[in-house]
Structure formats: structure tokens, C-alpha cells
């Protein structure tokens, strides 16, 4: 399966999940605690996942391989290898669908984007707190049609589905309510007491507490008043006057009887005289009840008369019933009227028929119910109020009208009530639409949609307004919507929205359109984001193992699966039992949460934790992402066999290409090879024997060790020291067997590994195959990696003791006794020496020529003679003498001649070129030795250089040991004039303080002057220390160590022997009180305390720096790993201008850049224009600049001015660079090879020195208003992440003349362009804290900073161009590295910057498929535009700058992005798009276990055949010269078809 070149990721369909599965897991059980065998249908079931034991079924009926493939009829287990349990999957069928949380919680949510739902809305639907409309039909909400996909709360759903009804409780204290039963009320209307209706609707009483029946009474009665006093008319209306009395009147009883009165209102009564009922013993109450007696007479008493009898009173005939005095006005009461008034013709009373309403109140208790509606007419004898107890029922005493009062509650509903006469045509619960028949043979029709409630008693049809529509909750609803989604229609709709004028709407439509197109193009069905079936991982990937004590340790996944299965089974059971909807809904929500926890625990809500601890369980997502996830832990970083680890110790006797491997370790590492050799030698006959032999006899049999020596003879091993910050962190060495248990390391490779011998450990690996061995030997051997890939300088160079020894040997002694004296002749000078007036090395003048007594006294005919004199003690190695060499006399020292011989011996056969390497005039310190190594590499090649280094190492160590140099406290010599310098400083300090007291300066100026004073004083003391050492103590061990570069820098020497000087506060600002003492003198308590500040800050910085630097390296590798040399020449005609200097603004002088800066800018680059020197020499266009060329250009910088070169920034190769644009491979000092992984090299070159960079934020001294300037590592990170700087400079946004107006707190800046229409319309406000760097009226260019501060690279891109942004980023990163003395070639930074600027933002998609606002690589826009037909509008774009993190995640390779950061987001996006990874970069190939498409992994190299010289001659090949690096293997990478430019999406 290694033969594939693309990998696609997509969303799995339910069918695909079932296809993967070998059976359904139905039970949550794992293994039986007694038998320890998997339970059937459980999470470890052998029938589903395969047998636990190789080729053995569960019951043991079938054993051995011969039954392979057979399924046991007894236990149902297939007989096969137990390895299948690592890849056989199962599945769980869910009782209800569940959403995949990745597509829900990703930002933006994929499901939400498609359905146009916000994250919050989608969550409400999925977790059962809102309904979503799936089929709206003709439902209405708030007067508008209901939309598909609209969310409804529980209440809204109930209201729309079943009608809105609200019940309002009326307190007992309310006597009566404000509204009548059946009245329409409006929102805010008072119903009763303080109760207010919250909606418009029909109000109905619920449980009235009392009823009042108004009976209509009408009886004939006498009006015993004189007829002449009454107004003569037949009828009297309510309130009409009956009579105005002119005399007193009395009404008397016509008969004897019991009085019964009817109240007619307003004191008017109808008096009935009734016959009394005789009481009997059994029914006293009945006897006393006058109603039951017969009416004997009725008398009408009008309003205005005074009644003189009481209810129930027994009176005699003639008794006074009522009276009225003269002048009284008698009238009909307002609640009654009179008709049929008859006046007697002769004698007798007036008779009238009186009509009135008699109100009878009936209390209603909870056991009673009203049978008629409020305001209904009742007839005499009608059952009005029913009751459980028949005797409590209320029967109407007469015809009348009933009113209900004091309801316990009022029901307000959106409904319409229709009264009917005939039979209704609908029944309770029916649904009707507008126009549907209700009753009366179809004459009564509904006006609204709704649900029917019949009131057969009152003969009413109530239509409660509601609608028949579908709305659901949970993933089931979402799945239905996704299933019905028409992507073509949606795309058309969104394309229309993209034409909207609103930018916000266009941005939203673009996001939705991208997702829609992704689903269309990938063939994914959107509904697959909802799971109906959950796959179950193979059991061996979620194992369960028995630990001590009989307990089981299990993978967290098993707990999560168990939880899911339990909930799923419970839901199935509840659904089959018909449980209430609320319970089912809750269970479905819990099932969704169980699926969420399994896929991504903790993504929503609080994570599921381990019982008994707070540790959250590791879900499937946790297995993928993070440092411990599958990508980074297992795919990109595997543990390998044939490896070991041990402490390292120095091996000074080793050659550069060797390392010492402990015997025991080698025995284990080379075991397979050893077995083979022992077998070949006949020591053993098989592997088993060989293994036994090694275990038992390895210490007693020499043959084992002899065989081991033979095995390792032509092998190399790899040594690695963590952290592996650059490629030199792993190098190959030939093993040398050593005693002990430590790995021995060559001292010179320590720098590359950053190793020291204070307990460091290193890992050792054995390349197994012949190809691996060959590759390791050719490309990784320590002696083949002498130059640093970062800057091309030797990284293997003499250091420490070696430098010290050689420096001591080649140093010249200079004595001061009699120095500078002039003598007429050599004899005079020697005479003075003999008299003791001169020392042997005192410089004197003889006949105007400088010499010394040593040079005059000693002239040796050859080096041997000089060295013999040293042995005899006549002279020292450092004495200045004359020595004849190759027929020429040199004024030098015996030491230098000895050094020359040492180098010559180290070079061996190539020692003839010694004069090009060793200069007898030079004292060899660190840099001189480094230059010598570089020269050797250039002239003599790698092998000779490795030999030279070994020779220098051996000689240097020997000399360092024999010289006996060491330091003691007495070697720290204080300068004699330190006291004077401090006294001067104190005097100046007093002046500054005095000026401040007098008000001549501000606090800020005083502080700055004090700091400057002490800085100057510290420098003066430092100079005094150095002068003292160089003049008086040139051979002081401390001075020698510092001067030679072996150990100790000038700052350390200054602090030891001079003064410590100013210290920093933790915030980086300077404390103005200096430490005057040196360490030699000792610090006072205060001085010690002051110094602890900075020291602690330093310690904290180092810890932080290491982590930040490592993370930066990782981000850089991720952004650039795909950049490989893929072509010979991309044909780019663009060039980058590299200025060699600049004109000083203040002096107007032209100043050249430093030599090292010019080197890191142009070394190894291809010229795009001729370079002409002042002497007429020309380097032609197309040449690559060697180090000699660069040094010559640096010398003639003023004449040349600038150089035009090709850089990776302008390279046109997709996902890589070409050889011409990249230039030299700095580690080989020659043009880069095809397939070189220059992106990774660039990332390592920038990241590896990151730890050396300071963390410091440079503070302006704690003074208010001074901004912080970010420096060091944070500044590098800020630049590579393209962040807005902390203190940002204001940049000119156009070319023109600047106009500055000053205000109190700010400047107002306006730029006048040459063309008036382009001038600034509004002024830019600049705070005064930012100092202006230009003056009013000055000419400025677009992109030019006009204030102090760091420029935002995005501004440069916007106002100027891509080139300006690129150069700025490169220069700013270099500024930080140079400030720390770190050399990194510009091209490495350019490779990274190119990756940051490869993106563009589409401003107008034109007729292409690209969308406005989309971020794509620029070649994609070009490709899309090229594909257009003539006349179509191409897409337009603007460049964008992405930080390295963003750029890494936006990459085309989903494997690379997912293994970097935000794994779930990347995989979600990629699977939605059905993204194909073309496996162009390195990481994706490493993940898949393929050879990387770089170096020897290139197809062109893999197809290359190895041939010896004879074969080459046979085929007539030209040159047969072999290269040390390729070991005689050559291939022509310029042949046609060797370009490996990838075609994305081909």
C-alpha cells in the first residue's frame, strides 16, 4: 500500500460505517470478571472483533492455522489471527439520530451555516430546548407565514399547534371582576383586582364562586290610596311619579295574615299577606315558612311611603302597613314598573299589575357546576346548577337571567365562539381551516384555522386558533432539514445574495456559499453529519488489561462507549413502552450528550470525568490532537527499535567521524548482524543457539567480541541529542567499541549538538538497510557536515582548550624593559641586552629598523633547530626569533613554526598547500582558526578539513595541558587608575544633581544623564582594565583566555577586574545607582541586592525563552516544510536589490554596511545584473557569488553601491524553489542540490539560535510616556506572526508633502499629494507620545514611517507593495539576530516570508468560481483566470500577509495542518470538502510512512543507479570525478523531466 500518491478525507455515510463494521455492539458489557472472556454482543465480543488467541475460536473447538477462515458453529467466532482485533470495527445503531459534534461546534458551525442557524439556535434544537419547523404548511405567526427552519420555543410551539390559552387566578378577596364571561379582552386590560390580561382573546370564567339569577316577577296587587291623589294613566314606567299627597295617607291590612315582602328597590315593596301553616311536631321549620302559605292579599307600597311592618309578622285586619305624610311624592321604584292600572268606578282600591326583577344569589362550591352560560335566560323549573348531592342542585324558581360572579380564574384564549341551532358537523378535537363547515347544515363556517371545542350545553362551537404544521426537536429534526436541502437551489439563492450591496450580507453569503459548494463538489451528503450509526473502534486500540490486585485498567473510550450503549438501550426500552414525551425527550438529549462525549469530551458543557476523580475522560478527539495525540506522538514521532541511550563523556582520542559505543550496548544494537556473522563463522547453527550464546558466554568467549568488531567495521550509527533544534542534532559516526557504559563523543562536534559533559545524555540509532547505511555515511557523517546550513561558517571548529593551547603557542612575547630605545648597530643592542638593560623581546630600533635582542641573537637555519633550542631551555615558544624556512628567513617564534608543522602533519598528503593556510605573522585565536578551517575546506575539501580539525584538536589539547594555564584570584588584576575614574564620575554626578536642583533639567533628562554618565564611566574602567592587562600582563591566564576566545568575554573580564556597572530592574529599565565594585573587590550588601534583580530576571527569561523558541521552530517548520528545491530554473526575471550601504542623513556621507551583513545578504546568490568593480573586473549576470566574490564586493562597496540578485521571494516554483533563485547550499558552499529540503533548513536556521535571543522588552527607563520597544525573541515571533506591533508607527498612506498641525495632546497630520484629488481628505490624529520623525513641509513616500515605533507590515503591504513588506520583515528579523551576534543568512528568512505572502484575498470573483473575500494562494487565482474564455471578467485580488500559524493552517495539505494545531477544525473542514492531499510536503509523507519527497526520497534519486568508474567509461559518460559528499554517486539533475514541480489538483 506504499504505492499511492494522494489521500482523500470525507464524511462517512451510514452505509460506509455499516460496511466497516463486523457486527452490532448491543450490550455495554466488556469482559466476564470470572472467566475473563469477552461477553457476547459486548464491547470486546470475539464474534464481532475476532479471536483473542491466534487461530483459536472462543470455545476452543477449532485451533491451529489450518482452520483459518472457518466460523465456529458453536461460538460463532471466526478462526483467524488475533491481529484482526486491531482493525475490525463494530457499530451501534442509535435509537434516534445524533449530531456529530465536530460539525456542530466548529467555528463556523457547518450544520448551522447550511441551515442558516446561529450556533446558539442550533444548540437549542439539538439539545431539546427549542422546536424547529420542518413543514410549515399554511401556519401563521404574528400575522406572517411560518418559515421552514424557524425556531419555536416550547410555549410558542404549543400556542401555534394547540392554540394559545392563558389562565389568570383571581384572588378570593376580589368581590367581582371587571369583565363578563365570553367578553373579548385586549392585552393589558384589567380582568379583576390587580390581574391584567397578557394577551388579546376571548375571556371565559373558570369555577365561579357564586351565581345570581334575576327572576322576572309580575303580580296583580291593590294600591289602597285615594284615587284622586293618583295620576290617572294606565302604565307607569320605572321612576315615574304616582301621586303628590295633599294630606297624610295610611295603608292598612285588608285581611289578617302573615307578612311576606318582595323588595322592589328604593324602599318600594310588595306586601303579601299569607295564610299561616299549622305547625306539627315533625316539621317546625316548615310550619314557620310563610312562603308555603296561601296568598290572601297583595298590597303595592310605592317609593315615598314608610313601611310599618316587618317580614314574618302576623297582623290583624286593619293593621297599619305603611304611611306617608302630606307633601310626600310617591313614585314607582327604578327597578320596577306598573301596568294595567285600574281605577274603581265607585268604591274600592286601585289595582295595578307590578313587574320587577327578583335577584337570588346562589353560592357555588367546588362540588357544583354551572350548567348554563353567563347572561343566559332560564325558565321556571330549569336545572341551572348541578351538584354531586342532588339536594344542592339549583332549579330556577321562575323565568329569569343568570349572571356568574367571582370566578376562581379566567381563561383567556385566542379563539372564536360560534353559537349554533341545529346539530354540529364537527366533534371535539377536530381541526378546521378557514371556510370549513361547523354546524346548521353548513350555514355556520369557521373564519380561522384551529382546533374544535364543543359546548353542547350552551350550544356553542369554540374554534381555538392553531395550525397543523410540523416542528420537531433534536438531531432528528436537523437530519430531516438536511435531507430535504437542495444544494443547487441554495447555491443559486446565495449567488444572488452575493450581489447585495450590504458588505455584511455578502460576507455571510460567501461563508454559506463556500460550505454549499464544498458539499456539492465533495459528493458528501449534508445529512451524513447526523449519525444514525456510531462506529465502534477495534478493541485492541482501546484495550482492557488486568493490573496487580485483580483490578482492570481500561481505556477511557470503553467508559464512553458503555455510557452511550446504556443510554441507547434505555431509550429504546422507554420508546417501546410508550413513555411520556418529556421523559423520552430528556433521554434523547442524554443520548446526544453521550455521543458528544465519545467524539469530543468537554467540547460542550462540562466534560465527563472518571468516577472518583476530576480527570476528564479522553475521547476520540483527544486521541488525535495535542502533543500526546495520534498525529504528533505516533505518526510524526515514532519510537524505533535498534536504539539506545546513555550519558556522554568526552572522547579526545577519537577521530572526527568516530564515536565510542559501550561494548554491551553495541552487542544489543547489532544483535541481528552478530547472529549472522556467528552463524557464518560456524560458532552457532541457528538463531536460538546464538541468542543463548550471547546471554551465557559473552563475557567469557572472545569470539563474540571478535565477531562484533567485524560487524561494526563498515557500519555507522546515528547519534542524537535532544532537543534536536537543527539537522546537525543527528549525525552519523563510525562506532568504536569502548569499555564502560558511556557513549564517547568527539569534542569538536559538541557545538553542533549543543552538548556538554555535565550529565547530558544522547540516543544512538542503527540504520539497518544497506541504503540507509550508505545514506547515513554519505550525507550524515560528522566529518561531512563541517559547515553550518544557517550561515555557511564552520560549525566544527577548534574551541575552548584547543584554542587556548594554540593561542599560547603562537603568541609573541613583548617585553617593556628598554622598549623603543634606538641603537646604532646590532652589536650595541646585544651589548645592552647582555648588560640587562633590555629583555629578550624588548622592541628596539637598530639603524631605523624595528627588531629585538631575540631576533638579533637567535637565527636558526631550520625549524628543528629552533624547536631543539626550546627543548634545551634557551628560548621559549613565544620568543621573537629568526628562523629560515624554505630558503627564506622569517621573523617569527618557535611556537608558530611548531604550529605550522602541526598543521602540516594533520593535512598529511595534502600538506604541500600549508602556506595558503598558515601565516607565520598571525597569532591564532578563535576567528583566525575558524578562517583557517574555512580556507582548508575551500582549497582541500572535506576529508582534508576533517583531518586538519583532528590534528588541531590533538595538538591543542596537548599544548593546553603542557602550558599549565589556569586562573587563580591573583590573576584578576585591578587597574591602578580606577579610583581616579570613579572620583571624576562622582564630581560630574554632583554637577548633574545641582543642575536638576536649580531646575535646569527635567527628571527624565536628569535620569538619562546619570545613566549615560555611569555607562561612560564603566566603559572607561573597562578600557583601563584592558590596557593594564595588554601592557603589563600580556601572558596573564585570564587575559589569554579572553583574548584567544577560549572562554570569557570582555563584559565578564570587566566585572571581575573593573566594575559591575549599572544593573537592570525586572521590567528591563536601568537602576541609576551603579555597582562600583568588581567581583575581585567584593560587593557591598546593597550592591549585591541591586544585582539580584537582573539575575533573577535572567533566570526566568531563559526558562521562558527555551519554550517559546521551541514553539517558534515548530511553527516555522510547519509553514515551510513543503518548500523543496523542485526545479533547476523557474525562469523568473524579477530581481531583488541588495544595497551595500546607505547615505547618512545627518552627515551626508555614504556608509558601507558591515562585511558580515553583506555576507548574509548576497553570499551564494545568483546575479541578475553584472557587478563591475572599480578596477574594471566584472562578475557576469547568472554567476553565483562565492565568499571571495562577496569579500571583494564588500571592499569595493562604495563603487558598486548595490547588487541585483535572485531570491526565493521572487521564485515562481509552486510549493518549492528553484536552484537559481535559492543559490548556494551553505553547508556545502556550492549550488543547492535538487530535492534539498530548504524550507526545513530555513526553519531550523532561524529557530535554533532562538534560545540565544533575549526575552527583553527594552524599556525607556521607567519614564512615563516612553513606549516599550519589543526586542529579542518576542519581536521575532511578532514579525513572523505578522502581529500589530505594541508601539506602532504611523505610516504615510500616499506620496506627497506632509503638513503637521500641533495641538495640546496630539498632532494633526495631512499629506498633500502632487495631484490634488489624491490628497488626504481628513487629518490623521497622532498622539504626542509618538515622536514625529519628519518635519512640516517634508516630502514623504507611501509606506514611510512618520513617527517613532515599529511599522505594521500590513500597512506597508496596503500603502506600498509586497516587496516593501518582504524586505521589511527580513531586515527586522535580521536586526534582532544581528544585535545578539547571531549570523543567519537572509535567504532562510526569505523562504519563511515567501510562505507568509503566498496568499491573496479575492476582491472581485469576476466570472470565475472564486468568491469575494476568499483567501487563496495567488497561483490559484492565476489558474482560474487563465481558464476563462475570451471576454469573460477575470478575478481581481489584493495580497495578504498571514502569520506563520495562520499560513500553516491554511495550507492545501490537510494532513500537515491537522498534525500542526486545531486538529478537529482542520479535519472538520477537510472532510466536509472531501479534500485530497497531494502529499507534496514532508510531514504528510512521514505521517503515511512514505519516503519524503526530498533528498534521496526524490523519485529522480530513487531511480538513479549506482555505477563505478568502469561502467561509466563503458557508457561514455564524461567526467568520473567523485565528490566526497555523494561518495562517487552522481546524477544529472538538469536532464529533461527532472523538474519535480508538483501540479496541485492535477
UniProtKB/Swiss-Prot annotation:
Cofactor: Mg(2+); Zn(2+)
Annotated function: DNA-dependent RNA polymerase catalyzes the transcription of DNA into RNA using the four ribonucleoside triphosphates as substrates.
Coiled-coil ranges per UniProt: none
Matches recorded under NCBIfam families: rpoC_TIGR
Compositional bias (Polar residues): 1536-1546
SUPFAM superfamilies referenced in this protein's UniProt entry, alphabetically: beta and beta-prime subunits of DNA dependent RNA-polymerase
Keywords: DNA-directed RNA polymerase, Magnesium, Metal-binding, Nucleotidyltransferase, Transcription, Transferase, Zinc
Protein's name in the database: DNA-directed RNA polymerase subunit beta'
Source organism (scientific name): Deinococcus radiodurans (strain ATCC 13939 / DSM 20539 / JCM 16871 / CCUG 27074 / LMG 4051 / NBRC 15346 / NCIMB 9279 / VKM B-1422 / R1)
Presence of keyword Calcium: no
EC number assigned by the record: 2.7.7.6
Amino acid at each position: 500500500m506504499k504505492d499511492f500518491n494522494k489521500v482523500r478525507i470525507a464524511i462517512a455515510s451510514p452505509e460506509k460505517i455499516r460496511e466497516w463494521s463486523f457486527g452490532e455492539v448491543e450490550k455495554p458489557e466488556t469482559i466476564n470478571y470470572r472467566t475473563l472472556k469477552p461477553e457476547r454482543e459486548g464491547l470486546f465480543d470475539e464474534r464481532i472483533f475476532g479471536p483473542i488467541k491466534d487461530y483459536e475460536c472462543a470455545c476452543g473447538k477449532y485451533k491451529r492455522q489450518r482452520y483459518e477462515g472457518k466460523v465456529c458453529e458453536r461460538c460463532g467466532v471466526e478462526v483467524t489471527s488475533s491481529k484482526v482485533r486491531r482493525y475490525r470495527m463494530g457499530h451501534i445503531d442509535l435509537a434516534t439520530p445524533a449530531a456529530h459534534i465536530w460539525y456542530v461546534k466548529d467555528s463556523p458551525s457547518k450544520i448551522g451555516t447550511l441551515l442558516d442557524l446561529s450556533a446558539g439556535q442550533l444548540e437549542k434544537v439539538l439539545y431539546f430546548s427549542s422546536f424547529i419547523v420542518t413543514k410549515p404548511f399554511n401556519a401563521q405567526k404574528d400575522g406572517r407565514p411560518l418559515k421552514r427552519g424557524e425556531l419555536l420555543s416550547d410555549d410558542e410551539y404549543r400556542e401555534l399547534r394547540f392554540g394559545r390559552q392563558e389562565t389568570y387566578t383571581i384572588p378570593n378577596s376580589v368581590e367581582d371582576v371587571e369583565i363578563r364571561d365570553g367578553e373579548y379582552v385586549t392585552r393589558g386590560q384589567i380582568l379583576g383586582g390587580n390581574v391584567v390580561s397578557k394577551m388579546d382573546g376571548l375571556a371565559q370564567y373558570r369555577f365561579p364562586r357564586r351565581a345570581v339569577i334575576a327572576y322576572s316577577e309580575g303580580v296583580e296587587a291593590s294600591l289602597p290610596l285615594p284615587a284622586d291623589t293618583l295620576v290617572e294613566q294606565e302604565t307607569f314606567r320605572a321612576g315615574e311619579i304616582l301621586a303628590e299627597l295633599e294630606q297624610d295617607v295610611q295603608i292598612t291590612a285588608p285581611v289578617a295574615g302573615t307578612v311576606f315582602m318582595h323588595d322592589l328597590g328604593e324602599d318600594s315593596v310588595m306586601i303579601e299577606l299569607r295564610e299561616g301553616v299549622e305547625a306539627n311536631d315533625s316539621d317546625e321549620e316548615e310550619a314557620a315558612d310563610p312562603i308555603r302559605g296561601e296568598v290572601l292579599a297583595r298590597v303595592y307600597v310605592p317609593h315615598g311611603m314608610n313601611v310599618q311592618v316587618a317580614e314574618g309578622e302576623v297582623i290583624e285586619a286593619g293593621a297599619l302597613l305603611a304611611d306617608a305624610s302630606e307633601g310626600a311624592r310617591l313614585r314607582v321604584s327604578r327597578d320596577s314598573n306598573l301596568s294595567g292600572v285600574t281605577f274603581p268606578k265607585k268604591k274600592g282600591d286601585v289595582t295595578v299589575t307590578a313587574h320587577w326583577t327578583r335577584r337570588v344569589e346562589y353560592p357555588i362550591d367546588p362540588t357544583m357546576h354551572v350548567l348554563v352560560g353567563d347572561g343566559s335566560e332560564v325558565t321556571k323549573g330549569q336545572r341551572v346548577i348541578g351538584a354531586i348531592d342532588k339536594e344542592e342542585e339549583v332549579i330556577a324558581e321562575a323565568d329569569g337571567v343568570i349572571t356568574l360572579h367571582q370566578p376562581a380564574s379566567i381563561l383567556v384564549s385566542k379563539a372564536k365562539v360560534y353559537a349554533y341551532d341545529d346539530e354540529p358537523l364537527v366533534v371535539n378535537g377536530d381541526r378546521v381551516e378557514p371556510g370549513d363547515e361547523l354546524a346548521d347544515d353548513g350555514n355556520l363556517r369557521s373564519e380561522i384555522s384551529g382546533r374544535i371545542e364543543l359546548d353542547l350545553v350552551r350550544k356553542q362551537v369554540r374554534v381555538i386558533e392553531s395550525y397543523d404544521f410540523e416542528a420537531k426537536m433534536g438531531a432528528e429534526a436537523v437530519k430531516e432539514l438536511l435531507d430535504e436541502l437542495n444544494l443547487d437551489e441554495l447555491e443559486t439563492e446565495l449567488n444572488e445574495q452575493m450581489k447585495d450591496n450590504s458588505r455584511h450580507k455578502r460576507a455571510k453569503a460567501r461563508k454559506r456559499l463556500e460550505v454549499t459548494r464544498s458539499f456539492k463538489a465533495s459528493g458528501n451528503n449534508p445529512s451524513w453529519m447526523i449519525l444514525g450509526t456510531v462506529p465502534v473502534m477495534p478493541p485492541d486500540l482501546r484495550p482492557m488489561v488486568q493490573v496487580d490486585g485483580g483490578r482492570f485498567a481500561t481505556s477511557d473510550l470503553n467508559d464512553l462507549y458503555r455510557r452511550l450503549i446504556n443510554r441507547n438501550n434505555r431509550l429504546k426500552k422507554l420508546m417501546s413502552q410508550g413513555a411520556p414525551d418529556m421523559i423520552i425527550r430528556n433521554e434523547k438529549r442524554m443520548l446526544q450528550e453521550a455521543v458528544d462525549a465519545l467524539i469530543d469530551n468537554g467540547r460542550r458543557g462540562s466534560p465527563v470525568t472518571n468516577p472518583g476523580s476530576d480527570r476528564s475522560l479522553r475521547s476520540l478527539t483527544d486521541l488525535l490532537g495535542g502533543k500526546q495525540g495520534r498525529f504528533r506522538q505516533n505518526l510524526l514521532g515514532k519510537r524505533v527499535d535498534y536504539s539506545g541511550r546513555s550519558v556522554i563523556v568526552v572522547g579526545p582520542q577519537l577521530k572526527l567521524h568516530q564515536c565510542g559505543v559501550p561494548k554491551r550496548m553495541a552487542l544489543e544494537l547489532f544483535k541481528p548482524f552478530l547472529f549472522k556473522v556467528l552463524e557464518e563463522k560456524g560458532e552457532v547453527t541457528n538463531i536460538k543457539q546464538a541468542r543463548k550464546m550471547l546471554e551465557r558466554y559473552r563475557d567469557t568467549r572472545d569470539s563474540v567480541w571478535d565477531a562484533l568488531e567485524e560487524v561494526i567495521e563498515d557500519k555507522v550509527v546515528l547519534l542524537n541529542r535532544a532537543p534536536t533544534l537543527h539537522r546537525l542534532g543527528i549525525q552519523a559516526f563510525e562506532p568504536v567499541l569502548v569499555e564502560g557504559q558511556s557513549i564517547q563523543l568527539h569534542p569538536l562536534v559538541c557545538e553542533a549538538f549543543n552538548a556538554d559533559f555535565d550529565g547530558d545524555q544522547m540516543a544512538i540509532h542503527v540504520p539497518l538497510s544497506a541504503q540507509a547505511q550508505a545514506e547515513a555515511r554519505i550525507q550524515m557523517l560528522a566529518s561531512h557536515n563541517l559547515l553550518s546550513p544557517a550561515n555557511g561558517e564552520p560549525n566544527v571548529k577548534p574551541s575552548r582548550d584547543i584554542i587556548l593551547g594554540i593561542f599560547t603557542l603562537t603568541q609573541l612575547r613583548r617585553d617593556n624593559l628598554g622598549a623603543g630605545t634606538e641603537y646604532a648597530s646590532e652589536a650595541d643592542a646585544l651589548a645592552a641586552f647582555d648588560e640587562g638593560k633590555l629583555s629578550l623581546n624588548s622592541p628596539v630600533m637598530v639603524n631605523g629598523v624595528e627588531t629585538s635582542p631575540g631576533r638579533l641573537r637567535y637565527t636558526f637555519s631550520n625549524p628543528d633547530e629552533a624547536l631543539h633550542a626550546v627543548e634545551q631551555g634557551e628560548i621559549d615558544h613565544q620568543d621573537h626569533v629568526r628562523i629560515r624556512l624554505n630558503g627564506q628567513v622569517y621573523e617569527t617564534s618557535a611556537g608558530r613554526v611548531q604550529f605550522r608543522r602541526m598543521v602540516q602533519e594533520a593535512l598529511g598528503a595534502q600538506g604541500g598547500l600549508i602556506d595558503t593556510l598558515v601565516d607565520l605573522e598571525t597569532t591564532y585565536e578563535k576567528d583566525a582558526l575558524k578562517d583557517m578551517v574555512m580556507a582548508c575546506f575551500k582549497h582541500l575539501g572535506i576529508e582534508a578539513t576533517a583531518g586538519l580539525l583532528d590534528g588541531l584538536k590533538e595538538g591543542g589539547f596537548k599544548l593546553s595541558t603542557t602550558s599549565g594555564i589556569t586562573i587563580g584570584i591573583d590573576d584578576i588584576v585591578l587597574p591602578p587608575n580606577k579610583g581616579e575614574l570613579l572620583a571624576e564620575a562622582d564630581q560630574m554626578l554632583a554637577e548633574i544633581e545641582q543642575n536638576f536642583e536649580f531646575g535646569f533639567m527635567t527628571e527624565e533628562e536628569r535620569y538619562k544623564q546619570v545613566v549615560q554618565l555611569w555607562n561612560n564611566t564603566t566603559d572607561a574602567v573597562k578600557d583601563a582594565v584592558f590596557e593594564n592587562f595588554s601592557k603589563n600582563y600580556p601572558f596573564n591566564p585570564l587575559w589569554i583566555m579572553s583574548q584567544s576566545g577560549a572562554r570569557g568575554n570582555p563584559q565578564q573580564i570587566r566585572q571581575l577586574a573593573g566594575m559591575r556597572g549599572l544593573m537592570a530592574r525586572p521590567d528591563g529599565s536601568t537602576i541609576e545607582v551603579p555597582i562600583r565594585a568588581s567581583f575581585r573587590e567584593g560587593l557591598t550588601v546593597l550592591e549585591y541586592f541591586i544585582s539580584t534583580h537582573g539575575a533573577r530576571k535572567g533566570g526566568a527569561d531563559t526558562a521562558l525563552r527555551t519554550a517559546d523558541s521551541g514553539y517558534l521552530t515548530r511553527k516555522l517548520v510547519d509553514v515551510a516544510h513543503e518548500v523543496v528545491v523542485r526545479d533547476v530554473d523557474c525562469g523568473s526575471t524579477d530581481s531583488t536589490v541588495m544595497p551595500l550601504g546607505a547615505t547618512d542623513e545627518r552627515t551626508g556621507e555614504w556608509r558601507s554596511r558591515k562585511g558580515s551583513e553583506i555576507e548574509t545578504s548576497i553570499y551564494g546568490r545568483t546575479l541578475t545584473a553584472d557587478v563591475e568593480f572599480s578596477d574594471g573586473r566584472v562578475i557576469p549576470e547568472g554567476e553565483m557569488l562565492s565568499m571571495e566574490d562577496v569579500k571583494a564586493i564588500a571592499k569595493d562597496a562604495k563603487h558598486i553601491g548595490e547588487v541585483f540578485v535572485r531570491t526565493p521571494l521572487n521564485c515562481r516554483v509552486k510549493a518549492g524553489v528553484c536552484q537559481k533563485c535559492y543559490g548556494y547550499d551553505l553547508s556545502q558552499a556550492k549550488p543547492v542540490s535538487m530535492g534539498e529540503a530548504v524550507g526545513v533548513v530555513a526553519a531550523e536556521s532561524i529557530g535554533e539560535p532562538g534560545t540565544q535571543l533575549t526575552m527583553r522588552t527594552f524599556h525607556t527607563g521607567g519614564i512615563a510616556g516612553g513606549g516599550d520597544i519589543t526586542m529579542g525573541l518576542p519581536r521575532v515571533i511578532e514579525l513572523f506572526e505578522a502581529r500589530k506591533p505594541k508601539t506602532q508607527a504611523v505610516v504615510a498612506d500616499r506620496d506627497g508633502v506632509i503638513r503637521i498641525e500641533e495641538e495640546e495632546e496630539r498632532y494633526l497630520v495631512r499629506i498633500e499629494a502632487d495631484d490634488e484629488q489624491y490628497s488626504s481628505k481628513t487629518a490623521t490624529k497622532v498622539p504626542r507620545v509618538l515622536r514625529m520623525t519628519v518635519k512640516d513641509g517634508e516630502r514623504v513616500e507611501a509606506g514611510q514611517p512618520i513617527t517613532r515605533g515599529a511599522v505594521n507590515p500590513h500597512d506597508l503591504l496596503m500603502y506600498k507593495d509586497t516587496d516593501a513588506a518582504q524586505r521589511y520583515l527580513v531586515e527586522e528579523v535580521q536586526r534582532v539576530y544581528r544585535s545578539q551576534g547571531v549570523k543567519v543568512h537572509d535567504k532562510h528568512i526569505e523562504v519563511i516570508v515567501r510562505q507568509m505572502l503566498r496568499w491573496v484575498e479575492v476582491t472581485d470573483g469576476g466570472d470565475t468560481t472564486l468568491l469575494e473575500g476568499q483567501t487563496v494562494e495567488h497561483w490559484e487565482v492565476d489558474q482560474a483566470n487563465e481558464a476563462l474564455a475570451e471576454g469573460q471578467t477575470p478575478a481581481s485580488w489584493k495580497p495578504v500577509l498571514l502569520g506563520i500559524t495562520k499560513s500553516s493552517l491554511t495550507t492545501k495539505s490537510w494532513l500537515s495542518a491537522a498534525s500542526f494545531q486545531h486538529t478537529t477544525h482542520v479535519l472538520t473542514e477537510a472532510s466536509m470538502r472531501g479534500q485530497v492531499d497531494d502529499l507534496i510536503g514532508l510531514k504528510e509523507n512521514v505521517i503515511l510512512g512514505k519516503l519524503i519527497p526530498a533528498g534521496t526520497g526524490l523519485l529522480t534519486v530513487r531511480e538513479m543507479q549506482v555505477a563505478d568508474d568502469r561502467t561509466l567509461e563503458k557508457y561514455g559518460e564524461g567526467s568520473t570525478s567523485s565528490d566526497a559528499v555523494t561518495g562517487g554517486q552522481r546524477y544529472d539533475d538538469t536532464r529533461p523531466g527532472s523538474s519535480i514541480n508538483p501540479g496541485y489538483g492535477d
